[in-house]
Each structure stands twice: as C-alpha cells, then as structure tokens.
C-alpha cells in the first residue's frame, strides 16, 4: 500500500461522528468513546488519555472517558458542552481524534511538586499551555497545589505574574494615569467597587474595573454588578463604555485579559485554595492587563476574614507592592476592619440593593458600606492626582451627596447595556437570638457558607440579610439575620446548616 493510501486509511480510521451529549463538565473538554470503538483500539486510547480533537479548522485538547454498553452508537464520539463549544461542529460532522502533543511543561510542574524553584522560562511554558487549554483539570490541580502555601518566593511570583500577563490582552488607554482597586476578599457584603468606580469616574479619573465572579464566596463583584447591568462585555464594548463614561465594571473573564487566571480559578474554587503567591499573581496580572497604572488594594483583617491578622496583611501587602513595582504598577494599601460583614446584604441581589440605597442617598442605606467606600474612593482620588493629599475623602463625600456618583453609575449601567431591577426571593427564614445580650462576634466564613447554601451566587436573589452588628444589644427572639432562597429545598438546606452549627452570632449575655 502506498504512503498516500496508508494516510487516507489512517485518517478514515481516526474519524468519528460528533454527537453533543449535553453533559456539563464545567470548562474542561471531555470526549466519550465506546470501549469497543475501532479508534480506541487502533490508537491504544484508554480512559484519561489526552486526545486532540479536530473539526475543520478548529481543534481542542480533551480528556477521554471510555463508555461501556450502548449509550453511544458505534462510530460516534460524544462531546461534553465544553468540547462541543470549542469545536463548534455541524450536526453529525466528522471529527478526527489523535493523541494530543506531549506537554514538555509538565516537567516543570513535577519539579515544583518536589519543591524546586522555577525560573521565568518554566512559568512561561506552563502558563502558555494552561491558557491554550492543553492542561486537564488533573494537571491544573497539580500545578495549583504545588504553588500553594508559601511555595512561591518573590522572584517566582513576579515570573508567574508576568507569564499570566503575557498570554492575555493588554489594554492601552492612552492616558498617563489609569486607576484601579482590588479587595482581597473574605468579607461578606463588601461591595464597595460599585460605589468607588462612579465616584472616581465622576471626578474625571479613568477607572476601567474588571472584576471576578465568586470563587469561594456567595458573591463576586461581577455577580453583584450583573444584577444591575450586563457584565459580559468584550474588549470593544468595554472600551466604548470607558471612553463614554470614564469607567466600567465588567467581568474579567469576558474580556480575557488574563485567560490563564480564568482557567486556574476553575480548580482553585473546588479545592478552596487561594495562596499568597497565586493571589498576588492573579490580582496584579489582571490589573496590568487592564492598563492600570495606580492600584489601591483593600486588605480587610479579622479572625474570620481571609486575612486573619495585621501581620499577615502587612506581609501580603509587601508582596503586592514589590511585585507591582516589578511589573510597572504603583500599588497602595489600605488595611481595613474585617470583623463583620459590610452592609446588610450577602448575595448578589441583596448587595446590589445596598449599593443602590447608598447611591440614591436613602435614609436606610447602610452607613458602614457608605463610609468604607468613601475612604477607598478618597484614597484613589489622591493616588490618581484628582485631589490633594488629605482632601480625597471630602471630595468623594461631596460627589456622592450631590448625586454626581448616582448619575455616573446610571450612565455606566446604560453604556454596558441598561440598568436592571433587583430581583427578590419567594422563600425566607428569619434566624433569631436565643438569648438577650450584646453581639460580641460574627463568623464571616460560616455566614458566607449559609448564603451559599441558600443558593448564592447561582441564584442571584439568594443569600443572607444581616440585621444586627457587633456591639448591638439584642433581646431573645430578636432577628439576627434572614435567609433568602429561590426554592424551598435550598431554604431548608441552609436552615438545617445554621441549626446544626455553633451560633454564627456570638451573644454575650449581660448581667
């Protein structure tokens, strides 16, 4: 048989009909093939083999799952939703299946697992393959775990950050000063960004804010903003919004400024890992890619916040400043109180309701959210040169009080696609104080967990409404917080969790 004939036969033998299974494997492409499939047998494929799928001009690397029985028809390859969207084949199209290319970068992952330092070239190789979709979730988990804890030193963190910036888009706004902010997180309801951006933009500074969705929390900034306006903007739409209004609040994943970070987050979330080096690289790579020059970092500190002590905040802050300097960012820090939730709502819609109350100047607006946002906005106004040192807070307060911030927020929402109404849930359960006394402490982590079990952020209106704060006197039977759920089952689930845990609100009984 001629070489040409052999190649034609091989092409035929490795082709299968594509079938959309409808299986959601999150963002990991999975292909399903029968155990008696001629392609499996001829190529020597086994479960977990990494294969290259090609349909026309499009290709994707996927993990193989082998199926027994007749769930799949002979000659068919079942594609998960992620694999189907990656290939976008026509119905019943042929796809070619072959071994995926060898990943040389995995040697660097193994080296890190065994405690070796990685240089810039190693991080560039790993992150390049991550961003290209060549890593399975198993490989991603190995890399994330190997870098967790204190396993990344300063030079490695700089190299990882630069590698993450290099594989994404980097925006240029044509301005000498572009400001941004980030909160390290771990504090329920701390949705200051939706107040800070319109205040700062109303003062003439440029603030293109890309925000994340929830990783381990009941709401991310993008989740809360999405209640009020579209956040899945592409780069062109983001640029139009910023040029028209001076600011935006969009989901970073939609503009793919740091695509490697978007991939890593999908395994960090179930592993509940958010180590210092990876946190710094994640935050600053997105800030650099967004074209920012001056960045304010909010570091809430509290026994149940993400950062537990002032010493830990200072250590993390130093790393942020040093890495920022290395990649050309001026980073400023503000260590804030992380003892209790900010505002009343915990969950996308409940937090959005609080934000609107502050912007509209409502009498019942949560004052702690207002004051925290004003301090951060004041810092940014001074950092960006829009206010002299020491006068940023006053300017921010004036802009909020006279309605300029509310007008700017409405303009940003309209530019992003329109201001929406805040949804509410049909199911609620009030949790009351068991004894009279004074609120001594609130467990932020357990409260956030209760909000997640109630359905947040997947159900945007779900979450928790907080009715008491640390230091407040309470009577037995007085409401402490309310669970909000979209379904009766989720409400029961969250309520059972609260009932079987130590009290989220610690009450000191008064003599």
From Swiss-Prot:
Q: How is this protein named in the record? A: Putative thymidine phosphorylase 1
- Sequence similarity: Belongs to the thymidine/pyrimidine-nucleoside phosphorylase family. Type 2 subfamily.
**Has the keyword Transferase been applied to this entry?**
yes
Show the GO cellular component annotation of the record.
Answer: cytosol
Q: Which organism is it from?
A: Acidovorax sp. (strain JS42)
Q: What is the lineage of its organism?
A: Bacteria, Pseudomonadati, Pseudomonadota, Betaproteobacteria, Burkholderiales
Q: List the EC numbers from the record.
A: 2.4.2.4
- Provide the reaction this enzyme catalyses: thymidine + phosphate = 2-deoxy-alpha-D-ribose 1-phosphate + thymine
Q: Which domain of life is it from?
A: Bacteria
Q: Which UniProt keywords apply?
A: Glycosyltransferase, Transferase
Q: Name one GO biological process term.
A: pyrimidine nucleoside metabolic process
């Amino acid at each position: 048989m001629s070489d040409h004939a052999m190649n034609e036969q091989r092409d035929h033998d490795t082709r299968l009909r594509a079938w959309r299974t409808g299986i959601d494997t999150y963002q990991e492409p999975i292909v399903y093939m029968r155990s008696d499939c001629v392609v499996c047998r001829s190529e020597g494929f086994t479960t977990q083999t990494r294969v290259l799928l090609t349909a026309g001009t499009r290709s994707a690397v996927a993990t193989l799952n082998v199926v027994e029985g007749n769930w799949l028809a002979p000659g068919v390859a079942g594609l998960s939703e992620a694999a189907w969207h990656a290939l976008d084949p026509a119905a019943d199209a042929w796809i070619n299946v072959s071994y995926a290319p060898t990943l040389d970068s995995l040697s660097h992952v193994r080296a890190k697992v065994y405690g070796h330092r990685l240089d810039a070239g190693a991080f560039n190789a790993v992150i390049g393959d991550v961003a290209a979709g060549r890593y399975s979730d198993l490989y991603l988990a190995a890399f994330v775990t190997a870098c967790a804890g204190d396993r990344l030193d300063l030079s490695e963190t700089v190299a990882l950050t630069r590698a993450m910036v290099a594989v994404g888009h980097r925006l240029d706004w044509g301005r000498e000063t572009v400001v941004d902010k980030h909160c390290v997180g771990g504090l329920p309801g701390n949705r200051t960004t939706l107040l800070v951006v319109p205040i700062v933009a109303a003062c003439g500074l440029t603030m293109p804010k890309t925000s994340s969705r929830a990783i381990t929390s009941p709401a991310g900034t993008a989740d809360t903003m999405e209640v009020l306006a579209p956040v899945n903007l592409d780069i062109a739409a983001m640029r139009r919004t910023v040029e028209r209004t001076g600011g935006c609040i969009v989901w970073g994943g939609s503009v793919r400024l740091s695509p490697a970070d978007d991939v890593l987050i999908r395994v960090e979330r179930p592993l509940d890992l958010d180590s210092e080096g990876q946190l710094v690289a994640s935050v600053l790579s997105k800030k650099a890619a967004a074209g920012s020059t001056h960045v304010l970092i909010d570091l809430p500190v509290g026994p149940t916040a993400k950062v537990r002590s002032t010493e830990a905040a200072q250590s993390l802050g130093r790393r942020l400043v040093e890495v920022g300097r290395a990649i050309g960012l001026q980073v400023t820090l503000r260590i804030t109180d992380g003892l209790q939730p900010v505002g009343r709502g915990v969950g996308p819609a409940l937090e959005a309701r609080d934000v609107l109350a502050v912007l509209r100047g409502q009498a019942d607006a949560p004052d702690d959210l207002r004051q925290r946002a004003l301090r951060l906005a004041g810092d940014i106004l001074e950092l960006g040169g829009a206010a002299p040192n020491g006068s940023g807070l006053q300017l921010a307060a004036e802009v909020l009080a006279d309605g300029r911030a509310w007008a700017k927020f409405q303009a940003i929402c309209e530019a992003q696609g329109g201001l929406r109404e805040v949804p509410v849930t049909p199911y609620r359960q009030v949790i009351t104080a068991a004894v009279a006394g004074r609120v001594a402490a609130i467990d932020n982590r357990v409260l956030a967990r209760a909000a997640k079990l109630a359905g947040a952020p997947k159900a945007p209106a779900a979450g928790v409404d907080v009715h008491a704060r640390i230091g407040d006197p309470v009577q037995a039977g007085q409401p402490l917080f309310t669970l909000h759920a979209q379904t009766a089952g989720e409400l029961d689930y969250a309520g059972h969790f609260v009932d079987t845990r130590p009290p989220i609100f610690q009450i000191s009984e008064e003599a």
